[in-house]
C-alpha cells in the first residue's frame, strides 16, 4: 500500500507540473494554488477515509495534530525553533505515510488560523503533508532500532536534507508564483527571477532545516518511544 501511495504522490506532482506550466503560459498564477488544494490534498484525505480508520487511530492523530500546532505556535512566538515540522516528521516515521500526511496537512491549516490564512496555506499544507509521507515511506512506520542514538542522528540528518529540498523547494516556487499574481505589472515569469527567489530563500531554508533537525535530536527519541508504545498497546 505504501508503494501505491508513493505512486499517487508522484502522479500528483506530475499533475502539478502540468498545471504550473499552464499557469505560466496563461499568466493565471493563482490557479495553481487552487489546483494544489483540490488535486494534491483531497485525494489523500479520500485515501485515508476509504480505509475506515479505527477510533483509536483517529484519536492518536488528533492528539499529534494538537501537539504539533501547540509546539509550533509556542516556538513561533518565543524561540525560533521549527518543532512543528519535527512533529510531522516523527509522526510519519512512527505511524506511517498516511498518518504523517494527515497530521502535516491538518496541523498547517490550523496553525494558519493563528498565523494568517492566505493563498500560501494550501502550499504549506501540501509541503508538511509530503514530509509526513516521505518519512513514513522511508522509515516504514518506525521499525524497531537497535541503536536509538544512531537512529535519531540519522533521522535528524535526513530531516535536514528533506526539509531543505522539499519544503524549501516547493515554498520558494509558491512564493515566486504568488508574488507575480499580486503584482500589478502582470509581467511574465522568468527563470532568472526564480533563481533569485531560491537564492534569497536559502538562509531561511537552512534555518528551518537546521532547527527541525535540532528538535529531533532534542526530543525525537522520547516521542518515538511514546508513539511506539501506543502502537503496541492499542494495535495501531
Locations of regions flagged by a protein language model:
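Transmembrane alpha-helical segments of multi-pass membrane proteins
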Residues: 57-72, 156-165
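Alpha-helical membrane segments and adjacent membrane-interface helices in multi-pass membrane proteins
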Residues: 64-139
Amino acid at each position: 500500500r505504501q508503494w501505491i501511495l508513493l505512486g499517487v504522490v508522484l502522479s500528483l506532482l506530475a499533475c502539478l507540473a502540468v498545471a504550473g506550466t499552464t499557469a505560466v503560459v496563461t499568466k493565471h498564477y493563482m490557479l495553481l494554488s487552487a489546483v494544489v488544494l483540490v488535486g494534491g490534498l483531497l485525494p489523500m484525505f479520500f485515501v485515508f477515509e476509504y480505509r475506515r480508520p479505527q477510533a483509536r487511530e483517529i484519536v492518536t492523530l488528533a492528539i499529534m495534530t494538537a501537539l504539533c500546532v501547540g509546539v509550533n505556535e509556542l516556538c513561533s512566538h518565543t524561540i525560533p525553533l521549527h518543532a512543528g515540522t519535527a512533529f510531522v516528521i516523527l509522526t510519519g516515521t512512527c505511524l506511517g505515510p498516511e498518518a504523517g500526511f494527515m497530521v502535516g496537512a491538518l496541523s498547517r491549516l490550523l496553525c494558519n488560523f493563528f498565523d494568517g490564512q492566505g493563498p500560501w496555506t494550501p502550499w504549506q499544507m501540501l509541503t508538511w503533508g509530503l514530509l509526513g509521507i516521505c518519512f513514513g515511506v522511508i522509515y516504514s512506520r518506525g521499525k524497531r532500532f537497535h541503536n536509538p542514538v544512531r537512529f535519531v542522528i540519522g533521522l535528524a540528518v535526513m530531516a535536514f536534507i528533506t526539509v531543505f529540498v522539499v519544503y524549501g523547494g516547493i515554498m520558494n516556487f509558491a512564493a515566486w508564483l504568488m508574488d507575480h499574481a499580486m503584482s500589478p505589472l502582470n509581467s511574465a515569469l522568468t527563470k532568472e527571477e526564480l533563481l533569485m527567489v531560491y537564492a534569497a530563500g536559502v538562509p531561511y531554508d537552512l534555518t528551518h532545516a537546521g532547527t527541525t533537525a535540532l528538535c529531533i535530536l532534542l526530543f525525537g527519541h522520547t516521542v518515538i518511544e511514546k508513539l511506539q508504545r501506543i502502537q503496541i498497546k492499542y494495535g495501531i
